[in-house]
Swiss-Prot record:
Matches recorded under HAMAP family: Pep_deformylase (MF_00163)
Protein name, per record: Peptide deformylase 2
Gene: def2
Top enzyme category: hydrolase
UniProt family annotation: Belongs to the polypeptide deformylase family.
EC assignment: 3.5.1.88
Alphabetical list of PANTHER family matching this protein: PEPTIDE DEFORMYLASE (PTHR10458:SF22)
InterPro entries named in the record: Peptide_deformylase (IPR023635), Peptide_deformylase_sf (IPR036821)
Length: 168
């Protein structure tokens, strides 16, 4: 297993649309590496393959306090959603920036698990928000894309400052 580099805005690879996985046996190492990368962040709760420069439609999520209950979603899709509300979001690809985003508070998501079995997840909790955020990444969308141009500029400025400070 390996810790992968997490891309930051404005990297154009974050805008790439993921491709459906046709054979889950080909992504087992990717899943393991994505989980290791997620856990290495210390505070991340979700990671999409496009955030590590990969094109396969894979999402890993772990919202457990102990960080030992991963949810693997292959080819995930939001089938339905209800009741929109504003909630604060952040992103590993937009470090140190948080903003309110409107999302469904209740969703149904269909996907494959890491073994290729079809799964359906219904959630009206925090997981619903996290799944939407990560699935957006697979479409080449970031949470800041929902913000005004001014707030997008502010996010870019903050991330550039953060990346510059990390490079020192």
């Amino acid at each position: 297993m390996a810790v992968l580099e997490i891309l930051s805005i404005p990297d154009p690879r974050l805008k790439v649309k993921a491709e459906k996985v046709t054979d889950v046996s080909t992504i087992q190492t990717l899943i393991d590496d994505m989980l290791e990368t997620l856990y290495a962040t210390g505070n991340g709760i979700g990671l999409a393959s496009t955030q590590v420069g990969r094109k396969e439609a894979v999402v890993v999520i772990d919202i457990s306090d102990e960080r030992n209950d991963p949810l693997i979603l292959v080819n995930p899709e939001v089938v339905s959603g209800e009741n929109k509300a504003l909630g604060q979001e952040g992103c590993l690809s937009v470090p140190e920036y948080y903003a309110d985003v409107e999302r469904y508070t209740s969703v149904v998501v269909s996907a494959l698990d890491r073994d290729g079995n079809p799964i359906t997840i219904e959630s009206d909790e925090f997981l619903a928000i996290v799944m939407q955020h990560e699935i957006d990444h697979l479409s080449g969308n970031l949470f800041i894309d929902y913000l005004s141009p001014l707030k997008q500029k502010m996010a870019m400025k903050k991330v550039k400052k953060y990346v510059k400070a990390q490079a020192k």
